[in-house]
């Protein structure tokens, strides 16, 4: 996980623990929902799903999860896999469990079952995973999100993206003053070269 990017880098089908910390105990019957959406506005209405190849590769180890669902919960038989009637978006819901003794976080283990680069699936389009805390009636109690990239080399990709992000945040250095040769003349005058303003740096705010 990269705090600077608010982005998780992981491998396909590998365990990804997500830690939930809440300010006060929620009411009985509270549930935790995880849903993936496309980050860019032009793709937001599309459902994030596995590519046809990984869908076909599903086997009995998938358990309760439908083959087209990208996000799965590991080690929880109470997980429910749902398709929204209106948006058709996929989500997985588990009952909220309080933190274990000595911890202030609830841990849920997720798996992401398709690579970000898969054709016919995410196809290199960035996704957000949205985690919501809901009461038994479906009312929203809390929400958070982070970007996810599923790839073969998470460590390498994280370092590359963090370096690119830092470069974009740094303002461009001011160019050195130009050295010019002038011919002295009694009847001409020359004005000094105008100083160039440094380019403004680009800043990105992650929500």
Swiss-Prot record:
Region described as Disordered: 159-207
Short sequence motif Bipartite nuclear localization signal: positions: 181-197
Cofactor list: Zn(2+)
Record keyword Transferase present: no
DNA-binding segment(s): 1-168
Entries under InterPro entries matching the protein: p53-like_TF_DNA-bd_sf (IPR008967), p53/RUNT-type_TF_DNA-bd_sf (IPR012346), p53_DNA-bd (IPR011615), p53_tumour_suppressor (IPR002117)
Site of covalent link Glycyl lysine isopeptide (Lys-Gly) (interchain with G-Cter in ubiquitin): 167-168
Positions carrying Phosphothreonine: 160
GO cellular component terms given for this protein: centrosome; cytoplasm; endoplasmic reticulum; mitochondrial matrix; mitochondrion; nucleus; PML body
Gene Ontology BP annotations: apoptotic process; circadian behavior; DNA damage response; entrainment of circadian clock by photoperiod; negative regulation of DNA-templated transcription; positive regulation of intrinsic apoptotic signaling pathway; positive regulation of transcription by RNA polymerase II
Domain of life: Eukaryota
Post-translational note: Phosphorylated by VRK1, which may prevent the interaction with MDM2. Phosphorylated by CHEK2 in response to DNA damage, which prevents ubiquitination by MDM2. Phosphorylated by PLK3 in response to reactive oxygen species (ROS), promoting p53/TP53-mediated apoptosis. Probably phosphorylated on by CDK7 in a CAK complex in response to DNA damage. Phosphorylated by CK2 following UV but not gamma irradiation.
N6-acetyllysine modified-residue sites: 181
Residues annotated as binding Zn(2+): 51, 54, 114, 118
Bilayer-spanning residue ranges: none
Gene3D superfamilies documented for this protein: 2.60.40.720
Alphabetized GO MF terms: DNA-binding transcription factor activity, RNA polymerase II-specific; metal ion binding; molecular condensate scaffold activity; promoter-specific chromatin binding; RNA polymerase II cis-regulatory region sequence-specific DNA binding
Regions of compositional bias (Polar residues) in chain numbering: 182-193
Span list, region Oligomerization: 201-207
Keyword list, A-Z: Acetylation, Activator, Apoptosis, Biological rhythms, Cell cycle, Cytoplasm, Cytoskeleton, DNA-binding, Endoplasmic reticulum, Isopeptide bond, Metal-binding, Mitochondrion, Necrosis, Nucleus, Phosphoprotein, Repressor, Transcription, Transcription regulation, Tumor suppressor, Ubl conjugation, Zinc
Disease tied to this protein: p53 is found in increased amounts in a wide variety of transformed cells. p53 is frequently mutated or inactivated in many types of cancer.
Family: Belongs to the p53 family.
Name the UniProt record assigns to this protein: Cellular tumor antigen p53
Protein encoded by which gene: TP53
């Amino acid at each position: 996980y990269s705090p600077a990017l608010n982005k998780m880098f992981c491998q396909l089908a590998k365990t990804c623990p997500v830690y939930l910390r809440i300010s006060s105990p929620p009411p009985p019957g509270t549930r935790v929902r995880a849903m993936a959406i496309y980050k860019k506005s032009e793709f937001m209405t599309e459902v994030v799903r596995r590519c046809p190849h990984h869908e076909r590769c599903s086997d009995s180890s998938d358990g309760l999860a439908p083959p087209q669902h990208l996000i799965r919960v590991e080690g929880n038989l109470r997980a429910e896999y749902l398709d929204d009637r209106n948006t058709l978006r996929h989500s997985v819901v588990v009952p909220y469990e309080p933190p274990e003794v000595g911890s202030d976080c609830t841990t849920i283990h997720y798996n992401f079952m398709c690579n970000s680069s898969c054709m016919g699936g995410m196809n290199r389009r960035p996704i957000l995973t949205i985690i919501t805390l809901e009461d038994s009636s479906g009312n929203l109690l809390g929400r958070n999100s982070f970007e996810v990239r599923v790839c073969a080399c998470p460590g390498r990709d994280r370092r590359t993206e963090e370096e690119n992000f830092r470069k974009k945040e740094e303002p461009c250095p001011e160019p050195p003053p130009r050295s010019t040769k002038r011919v002295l003349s009694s009847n001409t005058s020359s004005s000094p070269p105008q100083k160039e303003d440094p380019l403004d740096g680009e800043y990105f705010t992650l929500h």
